[in-house]
A protein has these predicted regions:
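Short alpha-helical segments in extracytoplasmic peptidoglycan/chitin-binding modules
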Residues: 1-3, 28
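Short helix-coil junctions and helix-kink-helix linkers
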Residues: 3-18
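Short strand->helix junction
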Residues: 10-14, 150, 196
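C-terminal structural segments of small proteins and small subunits
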Residues: 16-27
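A noncatalytic interaction/capping subdomain that flanks phosphate/NTP-handling catalytic cores
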Residues: 22, 30-189, 195, 205-215, ...
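Conserved lysine of the Walker
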Residues: 199
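Hydrophobic positions on the alpha1 helix immediately C-terminal to the Walker A/P-loop
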Residues: 202
């Protein structure tokens, strides 16, 4: 409005001017001439997750939060007033540009590079996940993706979110352990070992003999 007043644009033409400027900026973004900085999510918050004491605000299209995370949706009416530990933007589109940087990790499943704002992650094994742009401190991540078209793509978004969360958890003093866990005498008991060792079989035996509730059959987060 200040610019319009400075250039003496009539009030009736200001709306059209705003549309023209927005279209021009979108063209610059599309050609990679400019980009939107991490930390400015588009749209409204679709929900808040609370996992291991960490608050995650999720922005994206309606219904974008994977069903695997439904149990962690916060029911706290005041959660929206808190500053989240992680802001997660789920962008259902291809990235407008590709960021290059120093290569840190490359294998058949994952490529990680550093760049000026943090890290770029690419998952060659997840066809509908284009890229993840993440801040260096893990406080913000934008996941570029498309909706799953095949059965094997249904879990891809959840699998892409997991390393982003685990990176933040590590910075908060927690670590993940490949293990099966159960609840016994008001404490969590973890059984860890290589795949195929019988962790799930062991917890199933406890369930059968002592009716102990399962906590997790694959990955457990450990911290203070």
């Amino acid at each position: 409005a200040k610019s319009a007043a400075f250039y003496e644009i009539p009030e009736g033409g200001q709306e059209e001017l705003a549309k023209d400027i927005a279209a021009f900026v979108q063209e610059l973004i599309a050609f990679g001439a400019v980009r939107r900085e991490l930390g400015c999510p588009v749209g409204t918050c679709e929900g808040r997750l609370e996992i291991a004491g960490l608050e995650i605000a999720v922005y994206g299209a309606k219904g974008c939060i994977p069903k695997q995370l439904g149990a962690f949706l916060s029911a706290d009416d005041n959660s929206g007033k808190k500053m989240p530990d992680l802001t997660l933007e789920l962008a259902e589109r291809m990235p407008e540009s590709h960021q290059n940087g120093t290569l840190l990790i490359r294998n058949k499943d994952l490529t990680v590079c550093t760049w000026e704002e943090g890290y770029v992650l690419r998952f060659d094994a997840l066809e509908n996940i284009y890229e993840i742009w993440m801040k260096e401190d893990g406080s913000y991540a934008r996941i570029y993706y498309r909706r799953p078209m095949k059965e094997e793509e249904q879990d891809s978004l959840f699998l892409a979110i997991r390393p982003v969360f685990l990176f933040l958890a590590q910075r908060k003093g927690m670590f993940a352990l490949h293990s099966a866990s159960l609840l016994y005498l008001e404490k969590a008991w973890l059984f860890s070992g290589p795949s195929g060792m019988g962790k799930s079989t062991h917890t199933a035996l406890w369930k059968k003999l002592f009716n102990t509730p399962y906590l997790n059959g694959d990955l457990n987060l450990i911290g203070k």
